[in-house]
């Protein structure tokens, strides 16, 4: 059943308000129209593209800010953050992040997203990775979106904060990392 333009735009606006991280491609499939139609509808409704929506949500929904590094230095777009507890970031695998001959993402980009998220979740001015245990579980390809989720698990016997990061493409695990984080409050005997 084909919807009228007004009806489609109304439903589109509602959908984006409910799920601001939905892509134009996903919307096109859901509404059975072209990606270009979705983009034109968004322009008419003054709805920004995905990257701008992510930045808007990130800056407006946090009560806390990243302390250990500037937000623009976090690899990927941070979409959720609760210092010393959890954080989530997303990273779209673009052509500049892949090997040219096989379109597979370079592993250091997947690691960098996870590592910078582990740093960002620490509630301290200085946070450094002292040690990490990593496992890549499948290759990530150009065009895929990696969602990294960091959870602070506690402290080790050397008073380093342990951060576990799991990265997914859709619901499939592609990377896990356990990061042992040194931070300046370790020196002062705080936290």
Curated annotation (Swiss-Prot):
Keywords: DNA-binding, Fatty acid biosynthesis, Fatty acid metabolism, Lipid biosynthesis, Lipid metabolism, Repressor, Transcription, Transcription regulation. GO terms for biological process: fatty acid biosynthetic process; negative regulation of DNA-templated transcription; negative regulation of fatty acid biosynthetic process. Signal peptide: none annotated. InterPro entries: HotDog_dom_sf (IPR029069), Transcription_factor_FapR (IPR017275), WH-like_DNA-bd_sf (IPR036388). SUPFAM superfamilies: Thioesterase/thiol ester dehydrase-isomerase. GO terms for molecular function: DNA binding; DNA-binding transcription factor activity. Transcriptional factor involved in regulation of membrane lipid biosynthesis by repressing genes involved in fatty acid and phospholipid metabolism. Belongs to the FapR family. This is Transcription factor FapR.
């Amino acid at each position: 059943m084909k919807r009228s333009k007004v009806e489609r735009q109304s439903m589109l606006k509602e959908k984006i308000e409910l799920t601001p991280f939905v892509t134009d491609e996903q919307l096109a499939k859901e509404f059975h129209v072209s990606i270009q139609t979705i983009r034109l509808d968004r322009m008419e409704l003054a709805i920004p593209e995905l990257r701008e929506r992510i930045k808007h949500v990130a800056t407006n929904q946090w009560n806390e800010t990243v302390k250990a590094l500037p937000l623009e230095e976090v690899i990927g777009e941070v979409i959720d953050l609760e210092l010393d507890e959890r954080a989530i970031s997303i990273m779209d695998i673009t052509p500049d992040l892949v090997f040219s001959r096989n379109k597979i993402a370079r592993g250091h980009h997947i690691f960098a997203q996870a590592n910078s998220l582990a740093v960002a979740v620490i509630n301290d001015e200085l946070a450094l990775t002292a040690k990490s245990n990593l496992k890549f579980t499948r290759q990530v390809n150009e065009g895929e979106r990696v969602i990294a989720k960091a959870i602070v698990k506690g402290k080790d016997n050397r008073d380093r904060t342990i951060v576990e990061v799991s990265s997914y493409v859709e619901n499939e695990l592609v990377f896990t990392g356990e990061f042992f984080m040194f931070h300046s409050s370790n020196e002062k005997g705080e936290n």
